[in-house]
Amino acid sequence: MPALRDFRRRIKSVKSTQKICKAMKAVATAKMARAQATVVAARPYARQLHEVLGRVASAARDVQNPLLTVREPKRVCYIVITADRGLCGGFNSNILRTAVKELSKWEEFKLVAVGRKCRNFFRFRDWERDAEFIGLGENIRFEQGQQIARFVINKYIAGEYDAVYMVYSKFVNMLVQQPTVVKLLPVEPPAEEAAEKAGGEEAAAPKKATVDYIFEPSAADVLDYLLPRYVENSVYHGLIESKASEQSARMMAMDAATKNAGEMIDRLTLQMNRLRQEGITKELLDIVGGAAALE
């Protein structure tokens, strides 16, 4: 029967799609585990750098550094980090929605697009981009974050940007990815007391005794060295957090797609069996009716 052939063809097609989604889920799960391990390993360094910057800034309060210079924000730059690929649920759309909301606050802004989805989104709207960073790969390297950071640092020092923000997805857990906006430039060093409490669990620790640090060659020189590293590490951290969020979102999306495909196969199979049963019943009735007529 033509209808039965159509059902079999549809079921075969859905089963093929289900296999692809299941394989993509397995790949995303493995990649998510690696990306999550990278994020967890990088967080202690980020906390410690945050704390050290607060101590050095407290010791060098009168130091003049270009990255600390606060200007009236007339020309702001946004680094927007998305994925290169889709099939990851609302991951990309959530980040882009947050970015558009932030950009609407300013009359003039510059864009640094990280990820093919971000580049295509702004290109479609004909929004000018100062730089594009595409194809960073699955294993983010510190040098990649360093390259992006140095680009905006040079622009900021040259006076082309008055402030720099970064929009990325913060990895909370496998189920939660939070679009986040952070200010990169001008750098706002934390107060020493706040920096010491920035480590979450460490906040509940007993208060440390005041320590008088000696900086060599000087606190100003140490601060000049730390500020660019702080920005570079912040960008790198945004990249790895976004990568972990992307893989988590893709894993959940493919898991949902696999389950939906299974439900669709069950519905189509049930409809096909009902149609086949109707055909068999009709044939039996015809046979019984023919036999009765012969009698």
Swiss-Prot record:
GO terms for molecular function: ATP binding; proton-transporting ATP synthase activity, rotational mechanism. GO terms for cellular component: plasma membrane; proton-transporting ATP synthase complex. GO terms for biological process: proton motive force-driven plasma membrane ATP synthesis. Gene3D superfamilies: 3.40.1380.10, ATP synthase, gamma subunit, helix hairpin domain. Transmembrane segments: none annotated. It is a peripheral membrane protein. It holds the Pfam family ATP-synt. It is found in: Cell membrane. It comes from the Bacteria. Keywords: ATP synthesis, Cell membrane, CF(1), Hydrogen ion transport, Ion transport, Membrane, Transport. Produces ATP from ADP in the presence of a proton gradient across the membrane. The gamma chain is believed to be important in regulating ATPase activity and the flow of protons through the CF(0) complex. F-type ATPases have 2 components, CF(1) - the catalytic core - and CF(0) - the membrane proton channel. CF(1) has five subunits: alpha(3), beta(3), gamma(1), delta(1), epsilon(1). CF(0) has three main subunits: a, b and c. Belongs to the ATPase gamma chain family. This is ATP synthase gamma chain. The lineage of its organism: Bacteria, Bacillati, Bacillota, Clostridia, Thermoanaerobacterales. The gene is atpG.
